[in-house]
């Protein structure tokens, strides 16, 4: 059995880390330091690199909060990232080494959130099996996605198709302009305030992502004929075939025009033309999957969307 050596991540390894993500099947934009570093001062980073014979075989993006190792609190998901052909015996040894590290550092539990099933397919099944005996709870959240490979005219519900055929004189476009993103952010704050919450990202963090991730993220804005922003979305390109809507919002004064239908339809066509397979519309569950927001879920299903699950393993240290 080859010995597994652990190295704690520092920014000296940034390029090495991101290069490794690029050659793994399970790694996505949310695994990269170029994404995770937008809020590195928010959390106590405890990301790890696992090596065999001085070569990286796996990485774990993670932070520590209240004696809990979380992978990852600053992204939609985390999980151990490794090459598809990693042998089971090495995976088991990594699990054992991680256990020992947690014990030595008084870490009492691990929370590992895996990517959506459309992103990871069955890639993490071996790892989930390795962790299953230590896992005391699995929470599941569901998201809806549009299958862009089968997208065609009239794909949506009868009501949504009717809305799109009406001449509301709405136009949608992508933007990374700071002033326009600021207007989108103000609309987003107004939307979330009605639900007594606020955006996960500050405006500064949103602009950091837009400025540093090039074409991997952008804002889509829908305007009426007078130039008012009536709806919008912030989108991340997670992989080469999956785009993810992180925020969706609309101006309630224009709700009769259902502007979000236009925004999502435009984005679906936009990413289909770029060769993407999926547009993920985000989770429709609340309280870590305990409840489903049926009105939100029903809205997304009218785009002829499908469900994709995100699992979180809550793991005991023993």
What are the residue ranges of the model-derived segments?
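Short, Lys/Arg-enriched, disordered terminal segments
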Residues: 1-11, 308, 316-318
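A conserved beta-strand-loop-helix scaffold within acyl/acetyltransferase catalytic domains
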Residues: 3-53, 57-68, 114-143, 149-254
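Short, high-confidence coil segments that cap the C-terminus of an alpha-helix
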Residues: 43-45, 104-107, 273-276
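Aromatic (often tryptophan-rich) hydrophobic motifs at membrane interfaces
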Residues: 49-51, 59-62, 81-99, 208, ...
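Short, flexible, mixed-charge acidic loops at enzyme active sites
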Residues: 68-73, 296
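A gly/proline- and charged-residue-enriched helix-loop-helix capping module
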Residues: 73-121
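Short, solvent-exposed loop/turn segments at the edges of secondary structure
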Residues: 73-77, 139, 308
């Amino acid at each position: 059995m080859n010995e597994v050596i652990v190295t704690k991540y520092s920014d000296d390894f940034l390029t090495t880390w991101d290069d490794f993500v690029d050659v793994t099947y399970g790694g996505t934009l949310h695994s990269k330091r170029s994404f995770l570093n937008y809020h590195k001062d928010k959390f106590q980073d405890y990301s790890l690199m696992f090596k065999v014979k001085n070569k990286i075989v796996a990485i774990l993006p993670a932070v520590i909060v209240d004696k809990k190792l979380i992978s990852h609190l600053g992204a939609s998901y985390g999980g151990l990232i490794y090459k598809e052909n990693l042998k089971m015996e090495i995976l088991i040894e990594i699990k054992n080494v991680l256990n020992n590290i947690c014990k030595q550092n008084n870490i009492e539990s691990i929370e590992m959130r895996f990517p959506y099933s459309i992103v990871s397919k069955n890639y993490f099944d071996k790892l989930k099996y390795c962790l299953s005996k230590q896992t005391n709870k699995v929470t599941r959240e569901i998201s809806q996605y549009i299958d862009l490979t089968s997208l065609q005219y009239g794909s949506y519900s009868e009501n949504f198709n009717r809305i799109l055929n009406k001449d509301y004189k709405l136009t949608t476009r992508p933007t990374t302009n700071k002033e326009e993103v600021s207007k989108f952010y103000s609309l987003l704050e107004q939307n979330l305030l009605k639900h007594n919450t606020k955006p996960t990202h500050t405006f500064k963090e949103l602009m950091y992502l837009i400025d540093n991730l090039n074409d991997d993220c952008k804002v889509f804005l829908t305007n009426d004929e007078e130039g008012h922003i009536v709806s919008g979305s912030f989108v991340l390109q997670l992989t080469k075939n999956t785009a993810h809507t992180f925020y969706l919002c609309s101006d309630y004064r224009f709700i009769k025009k259902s502007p979000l239908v236009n925004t999502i339809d435009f984005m679906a066509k936009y990413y289909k033309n770029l060769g993407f397979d999926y547009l993920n519309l985000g989770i429709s569950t609340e309280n870590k999957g305990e409840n489903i927001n049926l009105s939100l879920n029903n809205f997304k299903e009218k785009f002829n969307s499908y469900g994709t699950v995100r699992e979180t393993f809550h793991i005991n240290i023993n």
